[in-house]
């Protein structure tokens, strides 16, 4: 009888172990970079002058994109797509925070950035590194940018990194989003993070 009880207990424990391990792994259209040891933190001023950190947005999925307001194509396209992502998430869209970090603090003043963000979504947050902070920040986030001269000293453009980073509601870096990914695919990925 003792052996029967012992075997029954072992079978129950084995079944529980299998059930506990049966949580389906998440599958993303974005590049899964869970566990990456870069792009982990920042402390930058927003357009109101308040210092913001990634931890300020705990409980939300966060998408971070680097750009500049005079960008002719990549930046407005990406921000327009983030509006669509938020809409595609429906009621969960309120748990998505888009953060735009300028690569052009010389021209992207708080006033300029505030108006720029409001033209897409007033809930988007713009952050402004100082010219001294920008090189280390770009290194930490593996963001390439390079100034290309224009006809006047202030009419330059920037070649820059066009991807985005996605953090889960616990503040962990999870995904790299390539430029041009469809808003519906990105919304599906973010939806998984919000439900996980």
Q: PLM features: residue spans?
A:
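Conserved helix-turn-beta segment immediately C-terminal to the redox Cys motif
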Residues: 60-61, 77-101
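Thiol-based oxidoreductase modules, predominantly thioredoxin-like and allied folds used
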Residues: 95-108, 124-132
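Short, internal strand/loop/helix patches
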Residues: 114-161
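C-terminal motif of bacterial Sec signal peptides marking the signal peptidase cleavage site
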Residues: 18-20
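Thiol-/selenol-based redox modules, centered on thioredoxin-like
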Residues: 151-196
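Bacterial signal peptide processing site
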Residues: 22-24
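Short active-site neighborhood of thiol/selenol oxidoreductases, capturing the structured segment around
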Residues: 55-76, 82
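A short beta-strand-turn-helix
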Residues: 42-62
């Amino acid at each position: 009888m003792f052996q029967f009880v012992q075997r029954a207990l072992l079978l129950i424990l084995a079944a529980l172990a299998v059930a506990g391990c049966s949580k389906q792994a998440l599958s993303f259209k974005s590049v899964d970079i869970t566990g990456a040891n870069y792009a982990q933190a920042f402390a930058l001023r927003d357009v109101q002058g308040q210092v913001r950190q990634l931890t300020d947005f705990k409980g939300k999925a966060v998408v971070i994109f680097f750009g500049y307001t005079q960008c002719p194509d990549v930046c407005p396209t990406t921000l327009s797509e983030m509006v669509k992502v938020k809409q595609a998430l429906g009621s969960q869209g309120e748990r998505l925070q888009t953060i735009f970090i300028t690569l052009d603090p010389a021209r992207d003043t708080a006033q300029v950035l505030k108006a720029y963000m409001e033209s897409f979504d007033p809930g988007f947050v713009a952050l402004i590194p100082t010219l001294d902070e920008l090189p280390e920040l770009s290194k930490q986030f593996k963001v390439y940018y390079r100034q290309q001269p224009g006809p006047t000293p202030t009419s330059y453009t920037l070649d820059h990194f066009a991807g985005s980073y996605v953090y889960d509601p616990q503040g962990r870096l999870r995904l790299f989003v390539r430029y041009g990914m469809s808003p519906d695919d990105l919304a599906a990925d973010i939806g998984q993070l919000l439900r996980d």
